């Protein structure tokens, strides 16, 4: 279904990946705390740097040591002008997507009441609107920040905080705005955490929490345009679990799952389904979900017939940490210390010489120097412990606290 056309080595393990909504830009957040943005070739042969087969040069737009610990999550703003990053150091930073220059810092609320309380590491970040971001954490909190409120030299409190889960929030998916919405932005969000899903209204709080599903729920994506009939509205939430099974949830019936699709079948349980992404309508037939697994494979599941129709391998050792599609419809997969770009496979009448020429045309691009001249950290060069994926296994004990206090911080200088 897809052919790999280039591979991009990274300096350390990938923890987060974000794809620009309108430009061929990919941002990565690394275990070292670095954030780096790449410009990939245009998907057509009319743009600068493109070649006849869609290949060209991958350039580093900017690179910096953004966080003093691992970068846990990334997200572009609605208009793509801002890149938000959140790190295990307890900071959220907003930077210009084009240059990487930071223009806003926010402290993630800590656990406890003292000045030395534990950091509550972030897990997922999303831009709700140009003025608002939503951030989830390891403790199961959901923080809403209004960026129009100028940050204080002392603290920046979230405008609202909800607690949809007792375990860490593993995914965060918006529900489509209602037909009566005047803003056009999502007000209700579905989260997965531990063994449940929850629906939270950002104005009214947690609306509903599902029954215990007896397995860890890892990832989610919302799909519209499915066949409606009977009680089905043609809209479903697709959730990836830790045992290789996708569950489908009917909109409005959030107490329990509606259907199950076995994606990875193994005698002792399948691989964890780490990340889900919906294929663009221009690719394939019907609604197809790309499923990134913990074993480095990406499987493609067609909804309706509810079966796996294709598979590619990103890496044979490291799991998938990032997966999505750029403005040109190319799939971008990330995991371990490599990012790969994939084009939709094209059926060819001939083989042999032409196919061999195409294989030789595929290139491996190596990024530039690790030297970072645009470091916004005051403790540059501090040695970081290399950390593996942030995923926790079901049943691991966690310290819980209801206290939501904000870490004080100085100005942007």
From Swiss-Prot:
Q: Which SUPFAM superfamilies match?
A: WD40 repeat-like
Ranges of compositional bias, category Basic residues: 384-397
UniProt keyword annotations, A-Z: Nucleus, Repeat, WD repeat
Q: List compositional bias (Low complexity) regions by residue number.
A: 170-183
Q: Where would I find the WD repeats? A: 9-48, 66-105, 114-155, 218-259, 268-311, 315-352
**Where located?**
Nucleus, Nucleolus
Compositional bias ranges of the Acidic residues kind: 369-378
One GO CC term of this entry?
Answer: nucleolus
Protein family membership: Belongs to the WD repeat WDR55 family.
Q: What is this protein called?
A: WD repeat-containing protein JIP5
Organism encoding this protein: Ajellomyces capsulatus (strain NAm1 / WU24)
Gene that specifies this protein: JIP5
């Amino acid at each position: 279904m897809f052919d790999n056309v280039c591979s991009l080595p990274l300096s350390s393990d990938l923890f987060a990946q974000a794809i620009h909504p309108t430009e061929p830009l990919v941002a990565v957040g690394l275990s070292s705390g670095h954030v780096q943005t790449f410009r990939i070739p245009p998907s057509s042969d009319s743009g600068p740097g493109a070649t006849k087969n869609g290949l060209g040069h991958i350039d580093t737009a900017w690179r910096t040591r953004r966080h003093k610990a691992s970068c846990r999550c990334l997200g572009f703003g609605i208009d793509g002008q801002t890149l938000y990053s959140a790190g295990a150091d307890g900071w959220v930073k907003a930077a210009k997507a084009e240059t990487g220059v930071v223009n806003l810092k926010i402290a993630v609320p800590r656990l406890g009441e003292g000045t030395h309380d534990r950091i509550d590491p972030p897990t997922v970040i999303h831009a709700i609107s140009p003025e608002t971001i939503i951030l989830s954490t390891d403790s199961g909190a959901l923080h809403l920040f209004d960026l129009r409120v100028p940050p204080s030299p002392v603290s920046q409190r979230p405008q609202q905080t909800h607690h949809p889960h007792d375990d860490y929030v593993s995914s965060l998916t918006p529900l489509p705005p209602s037909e009566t919405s005047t803003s056009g932005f999502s007000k209700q969000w579905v989260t997965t955490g531990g063994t449940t899903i929850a629906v939270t209204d950002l104005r009214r709080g947690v609306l509903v929490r599902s029954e215990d599903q007896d397995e860890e729920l890892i990832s989610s994506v919302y799909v519209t345009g499915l066949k409606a009939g009977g009680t089905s509205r043609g809209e479903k939430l697709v959730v990836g679990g830790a045992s290789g099974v996708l569950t489908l949830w009917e909109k409005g019936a959030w107490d329990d799952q509606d259907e199950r699709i076995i994606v990875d079948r193994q005698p002792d349980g399948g691989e964890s389904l780490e990340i889900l992404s919906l294929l663009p309508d221009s690719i394939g037939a019907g609604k197809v979900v790309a499923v990134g697994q913990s074993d480095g494979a990406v499987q493609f599941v067609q909804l309706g017939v509810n079966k796996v129709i294709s598979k590619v391998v990103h890496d044979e050792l490291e799991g998938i940490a990032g997966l999505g599609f750029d403005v040109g419809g190319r799939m971008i997969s990330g995991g371990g210390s490599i990012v790969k770009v994939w084009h939709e496979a094209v059926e060819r009448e001939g083989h042999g010489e032409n196919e061999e020429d195409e294989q030789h045309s595929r290139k491996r691009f190596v990024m530039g120097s690790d030297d970072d001249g645009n470091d916004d950290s005051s403790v540059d060069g501090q040695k970081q412990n290399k950390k593996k994926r942030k995923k926790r296994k079901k049943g691991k004990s966690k310290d819980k606290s209801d206290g939501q206090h904000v870490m004080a911080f100085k100005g942007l200088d």
